[in-house]
Regions:
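Hydrophobic alpha-helical transmembrane segments
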Residues: 160-162, 188-200
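Alpha-helical transmembrane helix bundles of large polytopic membrane transport and channel proteins
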Residues: 31, 41-180
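Cytosolic juxtamembrane amphipathic/interface segments immediately preceding
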Residues: 175-192
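Conserved C-terminal guanine-recognition region of P-loop GTPase G domains, centered on the G4
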Residues: 1-61
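Short flexible coil/turn linkers enriched for glycine and charged/polar residues
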Residues: 26, 54, 114, 183, ...
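Alpha-helical membrane and juxtamembrane elements of multi-pass inner-membrane transport
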Residues: 2, 165, 183-187
Length: 200
């Protein structure tokens, strides 16, 4: 893909940003369409769009799609945007990055480095579909997981929790609403369980 358009529900920013972070980690140019701002405003939710764009390292365009507000600005952003800023969006535990990078080194070189690391993390998280693109690295996954088991009890949970911590920090900086810490941890657990047992 040359460009990713990520439509985010402004009235439920924290939940929607999980996918946003995953897309941005791919390193593919991305434009975030911040939709349903009218609903967010009715719920007294305020979002600093410029601050959100700075945190994500990509354009964020406010939209009210039902009224056609922001559509032209979105088209313009799509035409002009060429590359996301190189920002470390998620602070993963070092053992996870170490094993993800080892897996990435075994993948074909025509896959960009950031996408190889992303695939490595997805594999460690338990995403079976990522193995189809990983080449020889797929055969070394068990070794990587064995190494991790000596330092981390559950790689998938640590990956999800790191992402939710980043999301919480972003929401705290750009919005007047923030879910409590226990709820974020529960959401991380839910994400892992859904991924493993429902294929979501």
């Amino acid at each position: 893909a040359d460009m990713l358009i990520n439509v985010v529900d402004a009235s439920n920013l924290e939940r929607n940003l999980y996918l946003t972070l995953q897309l941005l980690e791919l390193g593919i140019p991305c434009v975030v369409a911040l939709n349903m701002l009218d609903i967010a405003e009715k719920q007294n939710i305020r979002i600093d769009v410029d601050a959100l764009a700075a945190r994500l390292g990509c354009p964020v365009i406010p939209l009210v799609s039902t009224r056609g507000r922001g559509i032209e600005a979105l088209k313009m952003a799509i035409d002009r945007h060429q590359q996301n800023q190189d920002i470390e969006l998620v602070h993963y535990p070092r053992p996870l990055l170490r094993e993800a990078d080892k897996l990435a080194e075994m993948m074909v070189t025509d896959i960009p480095p950031r996408q190889r690391r992303w695939l490595g993390l997805q594999m460690l998280e338990g995403d079976v579909y990522s193995r189809a693109f990983a080449g020889d690295a797929a055969h070394k996954l068990d070794v990587a997981l064995a190494h991790l088991s000596e330092e981390l009890d559950d790689p998938a949970l640590h990956i999800a929790d790191a992402r939710y911590q980043s999301i919480a920090a972003i929401c705290d900086a750009v919005s007047n609403t923030l879910t409590a810490e226990p709820s974020r941890f529960t959401a991380a657990m839910d994400k892992v369980i859904l991924n493993r047992f429902l294929g979501l």
